[in-house]
C-alpha cells in the first residue's frame, strides 16, 4: 500500500490539477497499490476487470501473437466502470507493453474518455539474470524509449512510473536491517561478475525469433 501512497505523491507533484475520475487496478498484483492510490487522491476505487485465473503471466509466454490473444482471454472488462470516465489504470509493472497496450485499447473500447496508466514499479530496461525468464532487453518496451514514448506506444494519455528511490524506500519500511536491493532490471547494474559476452549471448538466446527457430528444430 505504501507503493500506492508514493504513486499518489508523484501524481500530485507532476499533475496537481489531474482530472482522474476513477482508479482501476489490473488484477491482482496491483490491487493494494491501486486502493491506496485512490484513497490518497480522494477519487473512487473500482474493479473494472474480471480475471480468468487459468491464464498465466503473459510476458513470459513465448510468442507475441500468443501474448496478445491471452490478454483478452485473461481479462473480461466491465464497461460500466469505464464509460464516460477519465480512468487511471494501475499495474505492478510494464514489461513488454503487450498487456498494457491491449488493456488500454479495451478501456477505450468500453467508452473511457481518457486512459492514464500508473506502474507500481520503475521502468524495466534490462533483462533479469537471477531466475525470471524475462524477455531480451531489446524486447522490453522501456529499454530504448522515454516515458513519453512508452505512453504513446501503449496508447496511454499519460504514464507515470514509480521512482526507484520510492520503491526502495517502501521496501525498506519496517525492514531497517535490509541495506541493499537487487535492482538490475531497472539500472543494468548486476551484483555478480559477468563474462565479456554473457549479456550479448543471453540477449540473442531470449529473442522471440531465436526461440521460434529452436522450437522448429525440435519438431
Regions found by a protein language model. Give the residues of each.
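PRPP-associated nucleotide enzymes
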Residues: 1-219
Amino acid at each position: 500500500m505504501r507503493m500506492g501512497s508514493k504513486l499518489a505523491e508523484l501524481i500530485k507533484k507532476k499533475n496537481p490539477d489531474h482530472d482522474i475520475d476513477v482508479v482501476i487496478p489490473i488484477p491482482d498484483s496491483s490491487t493494494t497499490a491501486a486502493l491506496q492510490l485512490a484513497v490518497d487522491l480522494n477519487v473512487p476505487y473500482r474493479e473494472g476487470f474480471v480475471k480468468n485465473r487459468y491464464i498465466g503471466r503473459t510476458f513470459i509466454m513465448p510468442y507475441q501473437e500468443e501474448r496478445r490473444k491471452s490478454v483478452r482471454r485473461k481479462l473480461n472488462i466491465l464497461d460500466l466502470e469505464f464509460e464516460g470516465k477519465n480512468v487511471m489504470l494501475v499495474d505492478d509493472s510494464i514489461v513488454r507493453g503487450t498487456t498494457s497496450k491491449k488493456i488500454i485499447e479495451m478501456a477505450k473500447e468500453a467508452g473511457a474518455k481518457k486512459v492514464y496508466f500508473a506502474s507500481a514499479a520503475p521502468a524495466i530496461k534490462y533483462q533479469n539474470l537471477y531466475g525470471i525468464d524475462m524477455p531480451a532487453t531489446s524486447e522490453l518496451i522501456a529499454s530504448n524509449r522515454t516515458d513519453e514514448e512508452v505512453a504513446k506506444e501503449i496508447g496511454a494519455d499519460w504514464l507515470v512510473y514509480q521512482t526507484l528511490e520510492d520503491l526502495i524506500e517502501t521496501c525498506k519500511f519496517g525492514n531497517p536491517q535490509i541495506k541493499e536491493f537487487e535492482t538490475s532490471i531497472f539500472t543494468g547494474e548486476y551484483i555478480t561478475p559477468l563474462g565479456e559476452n554473457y549479456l550479448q549471448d543471453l540477449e540473442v538466446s531470449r529473442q522471440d525469433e531465436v526461440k521460434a527457430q529452436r522450437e522448429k528444430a525440435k519438431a
